[in-house]
Amino acid sequence: MAVVIFLCCLLGGIAIGLPIAWSLLLCGAALMAYLDMFDVQIMAQTLVNGADSFSLLAIPFFVLAGEIMNAGGLSKRIVDLPMKLVGHKPGGLGYVGVIAAMIMASLSGSAVADTAAVAALLVPMMRSANYPINRSVGLIASGGIIAPIIPPSIPFIIFGVSSGLSISKLFMAGIAPGIMMGAALMLTWWWQAGRLNLPSQLKATPREIWQSLVSGIWALFLPVIIIGGFRSGLFTPTEAGAVAAFYALFVAVVIYRELTFSSLYHVLVNAAKTTSVVMFLVAAAQVSAWLITIAELPMMVSDLLQPLVDSPRLLFIVIMISIMVVGMVMDLTPTVLILTPVLLPLVKEANIAPIYFGVMFIINCSIGLITPPVGNVLNVISGVAKLKFDDAVRGVFPYVVVLMSLLVLFIFIPELIITPLKWIN
């Protein structure tokens, strides 16, 4: 009965237009009433406790770093370097989009921010060069969802807080699959570029490449500082967020001199708005997650899937299919916060590596960001590119097939994720 109440309130809230955070609070209130423990004070305290975590402090800092990058010229220079290196290839702007998305992923950790920044710079150029715009938009959207995989990743931070797993290990485990996803997308684009006879840009001279490298080196040095810092133990992933924000601010104001103090105000306001949305969503989801645990839903799911525990791979396939279905209709953050406490005990009981499960969870949910009917990243890039949502769906379809095929490969060959993690550690 608790499951029915939760789903009805969640889907009903979304259907009448409530934001997902308020829908989750509605679920929490309904579950408290069903469990005969409704108390506004307890609900408010649980809501506050949901956001009261030192690890979550990394989120506003990484959001701020991303805003500074966009306003301070770092994003522009990150796109310019791969443009000079591979832009002259047939369909070169597509390769630039994926490479830039991967570099941006190592700086912002947000799929929506990554996609919006790259699309704003490249889509007009692709349109001017007569690229098929729906395929181009699909490629950039697919590249944008690498952001939650390559560190620093806001979803990994949220998963780490929700599961109690090491955020540093989750960060390290995301590097290899993130690179593989980028390589798979570029290989797919190479095949399409050959069939579509896409035009190429003028080849940059060695001098232009050198100037672009010198100009962009300050921006490219940021992921080295972040990953190297917490990998060496110099600072924690949470402290890495503060370091990233300070470094981005220093480069934007002192080195590039493109961020003025008047524009800094707007950057801070935008970062505060984005952070408030994310943190309120996290807090609201924690209320529902707490009540789900009290209602013993994890135990019910465990009992339901108990016969599959002796077949870990079959169990994992069922779990991945379940996450995929939920990820297609719900945003990444609430999916992580709601399903993690339900599925993680079962994963541990089946002796599936929790870090591997965490990486697969986020990859699966990330693909959901570019699949209908919701597709948050598709909605964002459709707005930026002034393209109909249906056209964006058709454009992204071949890349979704490739990424899902890669997900299946990761399921049957977990060593593709686990072995590189051992090398890195």
Locations of the language-model features?
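Alpha-helical transmembrane segments of multi-pass membrane transport proteins
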Residues: 1-425
